[in-house]
Design a protein with these regions (language model features):
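Bacterial Sec-dependent N-terminal signal peptides
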Residues: 1-26
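Glycan-recognition and catalytic cores of secretory/periplasmic carbohydrate-active enzymes
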Residues: 24-417
C-alpha cells in the first residue's frame, strides 16, 4: 500500500512540475534566441560595419547612424573594450571576421596605447594615434588587462598574454597602496601624484568602487589563462576588499568613493554597479575555486542583486541609474540594463527562484521596446524616465562601446545552453 502511495505521489508531482519546467524552458529558449539575434545581427554587425578607421584602429566617436565624427580622440577604455568584445566573439563563434577585428584591435592597442617608456596605458590618444592624455588611470589599465587576456584566451597569441602580465605587474608595483591595500585611482605618466584625481579631473576619491570592480574582472580574466600563485593571492585579496571595504552589509549596496584609508566620502547607491558586481563577484570566486570564498560571494551577490532590484527598477522594468543622497537619477542607461539581465540570470541560477528569471525577461522586454535603435542599429545610450531615447547621443565615444551589451549576449548564450 505504501509503495502504491509513493508511486501515486511521484506521478502527481511529475504532473504538477512538468508543465512548469516546460514553460520555464520555453522562456529560457526565447530569451536566449532573442538576445543571440540582437548580439550577432544588431550589436556586433554595427561595430563591424562602422567602427573601423581606415587610417588605423577604430574611430573615437560615431554618430547615431554610424557616421564617424571627425578628429575625435580615441579612448583607451573604448579600444580595450573593442578588443575584448571581438576576441570573445571569435572564441565563442569561430568567425574569422571577428578574429580579424580582434587582431586589429590588439595590434593597435599595443602599438598606440601602451606606454613603452614608463609602462601602463595612456588615457587618450589623438585621432592620428599620437598621445594626447598620458595620465595613467587604473580604470584604463584594468581594461587593458581584461582585453589582452581575452585575446590570448581566444587566439593563443602569446604577445597578448605577456603584455597583460606586464600590466598586472605594473598594477602591483605602482598602483597598489602599500599601506592600506587596494588600488589608487590616478597617476601622472611617470607614476607621480596627479594634480587632480579621476579620469575626468573632477574625482574626489583616492579609491573608487568602479575601478576596483574592474580590477576584479581584469584579474579574473588573467587568472583564467595564467595560473600564477601571486595573481591568485591578489585576486583573493581584491574579492576580500570589495566584500569588506566597499560593501555595506546594512544597506546591501556598494560604497562608491573612499579616501586612501577606506573612509566613505559620499552617499551614493549605484544600482547598475551593484547588480553588475553581483555576478562579477560570483564569477571571480568560482574562478578562484575556494569553497569558503564562493559561499561568501554568493551571499553578497544575492544581497546586492536583491537591493538593486527592489530599489532601482522603474515601472517599465528598467534599472535606474543611481541614488545620490535624497535624489534619484531616473534615466535608464544602456549598460545598467545589460548588467541587470546578466545579474538576474546569475541570481536565478544560484537560487532557482523564478522571480529572478522574470526580472531578466522584464528588463529584456524594456531593452527590446525602448533601447534598441531599430532604425540605425545598436542601442541608444540613454532612455529618459518617460520612455523617450536621447536620439542625439553618439553610438561610440570614450564610454559608448560594444562591451556591456555584447557581454550580456555572450553571458546569456553561455549560461542558457
Amino acid at each position: 500500500m505504501k509503495r502504491m502511495f509513493s508511486v501515486f505521489l511521484l506521478i502527481t508531482v511529475w504532473l504538477l512540475v512538468t508543465p512548469f519546467l516546460q514553460a520555464q524552458s520555453h522562456v529560457d529558449k526565447v530569451l536566449k534566441d532573442e538576445i543571440t539575434s540582437d548580439l550577432k545581427e544588431n550589436i556586433l554587425s554595427f561595430w563591424e560595419r562602422y567602427s573601423v578607421d581606415s587610417s588605423g584602429g577604430f574611430y573615437g566617436s560615431l554618430g547615431r547612424d554610424g557616421a564617424p565624427i571627425a578628429d575625435t580622440p580615441k579612448g583607451g577604455v573604448l579600444n580595450a573594450r573593442i578588443l575584448w568584445t571581438f576576441s570573445t566573439a571569435y572564441r565563442m563563434y569561430g568567425d574569422t571576421a571577428y578574429r580579424k577585428l580582434a587582431d586589429r584591435a590588439q595590434r593597435y592597442f599595443i602599438d598606440h596605447f601602451i606606454d613603452s617608456q614608463y609602462g601602463g596605458v595612456y588615457w587618450l590618444i589623438k585621432a592620428d594615434g599620437t598621445p594626447l592624455d598620458t595620465n595613467k588611470q587604473t580604470y584604463g589599465c584594468s581594461y587593458a588587462i581584461y582585453g589582452l587576456s581575452e585575446h590570448f584566451r581566444a587566439t593563443g597569441n602569446n604577445e597578448s598574454l605577456q603584455r597583460a602580465i606586464e600590466l598586472y605587474r605594473i598594477m602591483e608595483s605602482k598602483v597598489k597602496d602599500p599601506v592600506n591595500d587596494g588600488y589608487i585611482e590616478s597617476f601622472t605618466r611617470e607614476w607621480g601624484t596627479p594634480q587632480k584625481l579621476g579620469y575626468d579631473g573632477d574625482g574626489i576619491a583616492a579609491k573608487t568602487m568602479n575601478t576596483h570592480i574592474h580590477v576584479l574582472e581584469a584579474y579574473t580574466a588573467l587568472y583564467k589563462v595564467w595560473k600564477d600563485n601571486g595573481l591568485r593571492k591578489r585576486l583573493a585579496k581584491v574579492i576580500d576588499l570589495i566584500t569588506t571595504k566597499l560593501y555595506n552589509p546594512q544597506t546591501h549596496h556598494l560604497i562608491s568613493y573612499c579616501d586612501s584609508n577606506w573612509n566613505n566620502l559620499d552617499d551614493i547607491d549605484s544600482y547598475g554597479h551593484d547588480i553588475e558586481t553581483s555576478w562579477l563577484l560570483t564569477e571571480a570566486a568560482e574562478t578562484l575555486g575556494n569553497p569558503e570564498v564562493i559561499g561568501k560571494c554568493r551571499k553578497v551577490a544575492l544581497e546586492l542583486a536583491d537591493a538593486s532590484l527592489k530599489e532601482g527598477i522603474n515601472p517599465m522594468g528598467a534599472m535606474m541609474y543611481e541614488r545620490h543622497k535624497d535624489k534619484i537619477r531616473r534615466d535608464a542607461s544602456w549598460w545598467c540594463q545589460a548588467e541587470t539581465v546578466v545579474g538576474c540570470i546569475n541570481a536565478w541560477q544560484l537560487t532557482g527562484e523564478q522571480s529572478y528569471l522574470e526580472s531578466a525577461v522584464r528588463t529584456w522586454n524594456f531593452i527590446k521596446s525602448r533601447m534598441i535603435d531599430k532604425e540605425h542599429g545598436e542601442w541608444f545610450r540613454t532612455v529618459l524616465e518617460d520612455g523617450t531615447p536621447r536620439y542625439k547621443e553618439p553610438k561610440a565615444s570614450m564610454w559608448n562601446c560594444p562591451y556591456h551589451n555584447s557581454r550580456m549576449g555572450f553571458e546569456i548564450v553561455a549560461r542558457l545552453k
